[in-house]
Every structure is written in structure tokens, then in C-alpha cells.
């Protein structure tokens, strides 16, 4: 396979010369010969300054980098207090359910029932331990501004659920985010390792992380009766949702390809991994493996998988042609050092800028 050729930008600067000249003839009497007075020609040389131009970068050779300024005001150990009031919504939004129902089923139960995950209407308010505070999302409101459902895969079987709170359009954002993911990490003894991992990633230029925040959650359940008080649900870890909004926030290409790996071993899967206009394309089957979070043109993905599964092509050539090798090496080393075994075929994203061939 041919390697990636670097294109050099050559700048040509034209040098021009401008000449100024004049001759004056003066006649002095009959006895003297004509005297020619020639003024000195002044030659003005126009100097051309050569501009220092940065070498044009070939997009396939640009390494993945995060936006450091995004984390400047982060306080790793701070705790934000959130108040969530849940109520029954309506059938059209799939929110006509009780809070008890939300906390009774795992994603596998929903698959067995053949239905979408239940949701409830929610009013999210942010404040301190005394209550919602002015200037924060939801302050002074009394009607729902969000929907709430469980999140996660195997963790959805735990007694303590993780929640996905989706703020409605035109209802504001929290730190520029409309999707608020709250993770309990019930089976993780320390409960803070996930946040610690993201905090450590911030110090590694070759990797891109996500913003995180400890959250103290209070929930008021109005789905079955009114007049109840807020119940203390303890500490959660909020993790930024990686989507087009997050790509833009992190200085990445929001128009690029982005896939969330749900269950995928990087085989070709020709009967499932197809382009949208191919016969037999099934988006539901596709997203059981790879959830589409960015551009829906799958050509680049298919090209990469085809070469990766062609054993006549050396793995070194495949990596060079299709992947940011620096990012992969650092990512793998980090997972090994952290003892993370849950990102082999899931819980990871594939990203590629729009006009790049590199993942």
C-alpha cells in the first residue's frame, strides 16, 4: 500500500524594479558649446519581503488533540447539587410512566419486551444544599424542562440506576450541555475511579477526554402522589455526552464521523455494516453494533474495515493508512495502566474528521 505523501506549499515571490530618470538640456550663450547637464538617475529598488508562511498540514497527518482551555475552570473535587422533580408526562413522548417503573427495568428487559426505554417528565434544577439558585438552569420553573431515563448496559441491572437527563430545546443548558449523564458506579468500590481516569486524561496531550463533575442528586417523585419531599440519592459522577455539540466544544469536527461502539469486534460484518443507500441496509441492526453519532456516510468506515480484515495487507500498513497511531498507542497504554477491561468491544468511540481518512 502506498504511504501518505506530504504536500509542501511552495511560495513564489516576484521581485520588481522601478526606474525613475529625467534629462534636462540647458543652453548658455553663443560662445559656449551646448552643455548638457544630466541629472543623476536615481534608481529606486523596490524590495520584496518574503513572507514567512507556515507549512501546510496534510489533514491525515494532524494528530488528535483536545481543547485545554475547556478545563481551565474545573475543580476536580467540587460537588454540584441538582434537584430533579419527576412526573408523568404523555404517551407521545413515552413519558407516561412512574418513577418506580423507570427503576424496575434494565435495558435487557426492554429488549425482551420489544419496547423503547421508559421515560418520565423531569424538572431539573441546579443549586446548592439549600435549594435551586438564581441564574442556574430550572430556577423559578414549575413545569418539566427535561425527560429522564436509565442509561448504561450491564449497569442497568443494578439496584441503583444511572440516569440520562435530556433538557428540552429552548429550556436552557448546563455548562453548554443539554444531555446530563449521571453515573452511580454501584459495583465500583471506590466510586470515583471513572472520574479520576478522565481527570488523568486531561494531562495527556495525545488523548481526548470528557468533562466530568461530582453531583449530589435529590429526587422528588410526583409520578404517583404529590406533596412528597426531595429524597437524597447521594453522589453521582456526571460525564459529558460525546455528540456533535461536544465535538465542537472540544475543538473537533462536528461534521465528521462519530460512532459509539455498543458491541463490535472490528470484523467486516458485510450483511450489517452497509452504506445507507445499499440494498438491505438496516439502521437498527447497524446501531446495535455502532451507534451513529455523527455524519451518516459509512464509506470511510467500510474502507477501513475492509483493509483491516484483508490478511494480505500487513497490520503496520493498515495502521498507517487508517489510524492515528500515536493516539492508539497512548490510548492502549492508558487502559492497561488503569486496568480498564471494559473498553475492548464497547464503551469507546470511533471518530474521524470529515475530510480525513484517519480514525
Task: Report the location of each language-model feature.
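Regulatory N- and C-terminal appendages and interdomain linkers associated
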Residues: 11, 16-141
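Active-site acidic catalytic loop and adjacent metal/ATP-binding pocket
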Residues: 84, 165, 321-359
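Conserved oxyanion/phosphate-binding beta-strand-loop segments in alpha/beta enzyme cores
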Residues: 120-184, 293-300
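Short beta-strand micro-motifs enriched in acidic
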Residues: 151, 220, 351-355
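Internal "kinase-insert"/substrate-recognition segments embedded within catalytic cores
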Residues: 169-171, 207-210, 226-333, 341
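A conserved helix-loop-beta module that forms one wall/lid of the active-site cleft
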Residues: 189-222
